[in-house]
């Protein structure tokens, strides 16, 4: 039952991305939504909430818990420092985004390697068909692999 809130927030994140893409065009990366919405804090707040809701679930599921922690804290810092074009926030944002993606992927590999393989294949196909938004597709696939791994492990438990 604890997985309902994180999955709801994940679905909300995808909905916000889809609505933004429909109205403004597909962003080159998820973080671009912050600037595209006039520096609205909606997406950063959702990312922080998503990270904090996934943390206890990921820790309970096992795997390498330090990777689960780094994944969620990285995503929380991405949301906490959304102004990646600002000199003061750029290094925090960029480092946190890289940390969240790498740690999330490694955590998923320790839990459900097949999910990572499918997500990587999807990212490659999306990147080849939409080269301008390659980073966006990699981010969506990385975030989705974590969500799918959480759902699969929760249902299997």
Go through each PLM region and give its residues.
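C-terminal TM-helix exit segments that contain a strictly Trp-centered aromatic cap at the helix terminus
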Residues: 14-19, 81-83, 152
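Helix-coil boundary and interhelical linker segments in multi-pass alpha-helical membrane proteins
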Residues: 1-4, 55-66, 106-115, 155-157
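Terminal transmembrane helical module of multi-pass membrane proteins
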Residues: 112-157
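Juxtamembrane "helix-exit" motif on the non-cytosolic side of transmembrane helices
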Residues: 57-61, 80-87, 127-132, 154-156
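N-terminal topogenic module of multi-pass integral membrane proteins
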Residues: 1-61
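Membrane-proximal helix-loop-helix units in multi-pass membrane proteins
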Residues: 65-119
